[in-house]
Amino acid sequence: MSDQIIARVSQSLAKEQSLESLVRQLLEMLEMVTDMESTYLTKVDVEARLQHIMFARNSQKMYIPENFTVSWDYSLCKRAIDENCFFSDEVPDRWGDCIAARNLGITTFLSTPIHLPDGSFYGTLCAASSEKRQWSERAEQVLQLFAGLIAQYIQKEALVEQLREANAALIAQSYTDSLTGLPNRRAIFENLTTLFSLARHLNHKIMIAFIDLDNFKLINDRFGHNSGDLFLIQVGERLNTLQQNGEVIGRLGGDEFLVVSLNNENADISSLRERIQQQIRGEYHLGDVDLYYPGASLGIVEVDPETTDADSALHAADIAMYQEKKHKQKTPFVAHPALHS
């Protein structure tokens, strides 16, 4: 193998690039070494029995189309693998029944299968020409080398994608309350920063509703933690259904939830209070017990984001909630054995 090819391969591998970018460079070099008109990479779906041409280089009159799919069972590549014949300069005579080869005018064909490091079959790396070309050991070596490099790169990209997906899942998990599926405290505070910035830009005020579920500890103590968890889950589901554009709804932790809304001409504290209470108040089915819940303690404040930051607004809503809890008439929940069990 010439020093020029080795140098170009080394340069290509040293760059951070996509699979497509790498393959296109290798196809160009493969064309130089094999003296073929077309070089191309295919991916094979063995279950569907289809071969897909992913990337192709065509420098002369022969044209191998990209994004072209053929039957795997009737392809040149499968014939080459089945017969262990990876080079032929007599394709019309040897594989004259191959319609694709006949339509493309292929006379000389060189290919090698690509197996990923885990042993799975990926596809083929090929070179073809409408004219007779001689086989060379150098061309065979380069073809095998490039097939191995592509296999390694495909495996690397797959691993990187798995890492990306795992990282995205971890990020999503870190921003989600595991019990209710609502945004958690971390997500709430980050969304608040964005919401306050938006409100300043729109010259809107912000309403913050701090929600404390009265008698939640009593529900837990009397009916067990499973019933308590079901209660929290159902409260979260109900709050989620009232979400409107420009609102942040989440669980701060324990029995505390938060609703933050961009104020507009059609909204006020009393209407937001009623929306929330209507959602929370009502029947809950908690496994072996049905429970009528009269409502939560709400602390709702309206703030100007130009003069009040998110932390101060939350603190004010928290104080307002405790003031309501302190002065509200105690209305116990009513529970009875579940009729649906």
Curated annotation (Swiss-Prot):
**Swiss-Prot/TrEMBL cofactor(s):** Mg(2+)
Which residues make up the binding site for Mg(2+)?
Answer: D212, D255
Q: Which PANTHER family match?
A: DIGUANYLATE CYCLASE DGCM-RELATED (PTHR45138:SF9), REGULATORY COMPONENTS OF SENSORY TRANSDUCTION SYSTEM (PTHR45138)
- Entry's cofactor comment: Binds 1 Mg(2+) ion per monomer.
NCBIfam families named among the record's database cross-references: GGDEF
Residue span(s) of domain GAF: 18-154
Question: Which keywords, in A-to-Z order, does the entry hold?
Answer: GTP-binding, Magnesium, Metal-binding, Nucleotide-binding, Transferase
> Which residues does the annotation list for site: Transition state stabilizer?
K217
Domain of life (superkingdom)? Bacteria
Which protein, by its recorded name, is this? Diguanylate cyclase DgcP
**Residues annotated for substrate binding in this entry:** N220, H225, D229
Please name the gene that encodes this protein: dgcP
**Role, per record:** Catalyzes the synthesis of cyclic-di-GMP (c-di-GMP) via the condensation of 2 GTP molecules. Cyclic-di-GMP is a second messenger which controls cell surface-associated traits in bacteria.
| SMART domains per the UniProt record, alphabetical | GAF (SM00065), GGDEF (SM00267)
Q: Which reaction does it catalyse?
A: 2 GTP = 3',3'-c-di-GMP + 2 diphosphate
Active-site residues are D255
How is this protein induced? Expressed during exponential and post-exponential growth at both 28 and 37 degrees Celsius.
What does the entry list under GO cellular component? plasma membrane
